[in-house]
Regions:
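Active-site environment of divalent metal-dependent phosphoester hydrolases
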Residues: 1-6, 66, 91-102, 116-121
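Active-site neighborhood of divalent metal-dependent phosphoester bond hydrolases
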Residues: 1-48, 54-58, 70-85
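Divalent metal-coordination and catalytic microenvironments
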Residues: 40, 60, 94, 112, ...
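Short, solvent-exposed coil/turn segments
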Residues: 42, 51-52, 104, 122
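Short, acidic/polar N-cap/turn motifs at the starts of alpha helices
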Residues: 44-48, 97-98, 124-126
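Active-site-proximal beta-strand elements of phosphoester/diester hydrolases
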Residues: 55-62, 108-112
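Anionic-ligand binding region
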Residues: 73-109
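Acidic, His/Gly-rich catalytic cores of divalent-metal-dependent hydrolytic chemistry
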Residues: 102-147
Length: 147
């Protein structure tokens, strides 16, 4: 979490970040230990996880550039760059816009955001993936009414 680290190192003003993103970063610094913060700062930019023989590539942004945003209306040629012969699912975030795209060998999914959806304020987005049959379901609800 680059923004969190910059706030922690006093390289950016937390008030500016709070105006744009809310108080999550401030709460993290207040309530997490230095060890927990260090863990977050040193997470890999990309990771592979296998559950029930289903392979997931985890990314914050695009697989080739974690700072690149992918949107539902991103050009197909760009989305196809996410195709992976080594993974069943390629999971991305960063844009907070929920969408999925069948890349051929893998399914690209951005589940959106529970707390900061960019599609519509107050809507929580998430995705459930069934590792028994490789099915997935994208979900959303009004955040205050979510189960």
């Amino acid at each position: 979490e680059v923004i969190l680290q910059l706030i922690f190192e006093k390289k950016i003003d937390p008030k500016i970040i709070k105006q744009k993103y809310g108080s999550g970063h401030e709460l993290a610094i207040k309530h997490l230990t230095n060890s927990q913060l260090s863990y977050l700062f040193n997470l890999p930019s990309q990771r592979t996880v296998v559950l029930n023989d289903i392979s997931f590539q985890l990314n914050h942004g695009a697989p080739w550039d974690q700072d690149e945003y992918l949107y539902p209306d991103t050009k197909i040629k760009t989305l196809l760059r996410c195709n992976s012969i080594n993974h069943n699912f390629v999971l991305v975030g960063h844009s907070h816009y929920s969408f999925y795209f069948d890349c051929g060998n893998s399914i690209l999914i951005n589940c959106g955001s529970v707390g900061q959806s960019r599609k519509k304020g107050g809507i929580a987005n998430w995705t459930l993936i069934d590792t028994n049959n490789k099915s997935y379901k994208m979900n959303d609800c009004l955040a205050k009414f979510c189960p």
